[in-house]
Each structure stands twice: as structure tokens, then as C-alpha cells.
Amino acid sequence: MELKTCNILGLDILVTDMEKTVNLIEQNIEQLRGKYICVGNVHTTVMAHDDPQYHTVQADAAFVLPDGGPLSGYSRKHGFPEAERVTGPDLMLALFARDNGLKHYFYGSSEETLALLKEKLAEKYPHLQIAGMVSPPFRELSEAEDKEMVDQINASGADIIWVGLGAPKQEKWMYAHKNHVNGVMIGVGAVSYTHLT
């Protein structure tokens, strides 16, 4: 995968738009397995600048998308006129709309939100393959519980795991599960699911 990026506060942010991003994920789904994608905004970019540990987490992603308007705006002002904002909820909808046979797994949010999301997605995207949905406990999982959760995700055959735990928790979770989860993990934020219901 050849990626064009713009360095913002020491973090490489992907120069892209929605169509390019969807194509990038679809065409490289096998290469992306076991990896993760961060959906960055000003808050997470500044946090990565100020916290070396969180910077490592962000920098280790397959790529960081410009969810925040100021990030794509900065890229445009610094030699990348094609840079556009790619938000988590919009990326989800764009991928759901494609009849590409990919299986989606949803990790995070409440049982109620997930049930409503499942209902809405079935109505709007009847072709969409939902491999599973889970609302993990708010507390940290034990090692055994975590292994069980990973086994459950992998057994589902999910291609894309949407991680909605909120920043920085979701990025740290994806970093810890790199090469353990078989699909590509995309951190979209806890509110992304509610945007879709």
C-alpha cells in the first residue's frame, strides 16, 4: 500500500477523501487483517503530541484518517489540495452501502444502542453482513475474558471490526490486539453508533 500523508504535530495523517478511503480498505482488506486504522481529530492528534505512549499507539496504525476538519484543512494548506475530511460515521455508511461481501463486527456501546443499530442497518442495508455485536463491560477485562472476546470475534469471520469505545481507550485496545484479531479494526468512537440509529 503506497500512502500519501501529511505530518501534523509529528503524526502522519492520511491525505485522502471518502472514495479513496473506501477503495483503499476494500482493495487491501487481506493486507490489513490484524492491523488497525485510527480516525483522528484535533484532540487525538494533540494528545499523541503530548503523550509519547499514545503517539506510539497512533503511529503504529496502518494509517490515521483525518476525521477532524482542521486536519484536512491543514493538509490542504500544506501542499495537498486533494485532502478531505473522512469522519467515522460517514466511513461506516460508505462501507455499508457497498455490496462487497465484507462481514462487519461491532465492538463497544450499550446493548440498547447495538440492538437499535442492528434493526436500522437491517432496514437500510439488507445486504449487509453483520458478523456480531458486543457491548463489553466498562471495566477492564481479565486476561481470560479478553481471550474469550478475541476468540469470539475471530470465530465470527469478521473482516472489519468497528471499535466504538471512545478515545483514547479504543486506540489502546486496538494497539493491544494488533495481530490477535483477524480482521481490520477501525476506531470510530463511542458516539458513531448513536449517529447511525
Residue ranges with predicted function:
Residues 22, 114-115, 169-174:
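Short, well-ordered alpha-helical microsegments
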Residues 194-197:
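Conserved small/polar residues in nucleotide/adenosyl-binding loops
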Residues 145-182:
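A contiguous pocket-lining binding segment that forms or flanks enzyme active sites
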Residues 1-85, 89-90:
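N-terminal nucleotide/polyanion-binding subdomain common to many enzyme families
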Residues 50-51, 77-78, 118-119, 173-176:
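Short amphipathic alpha-helical segments
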Residues 72-152, 156:
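Conserved beta-alpha
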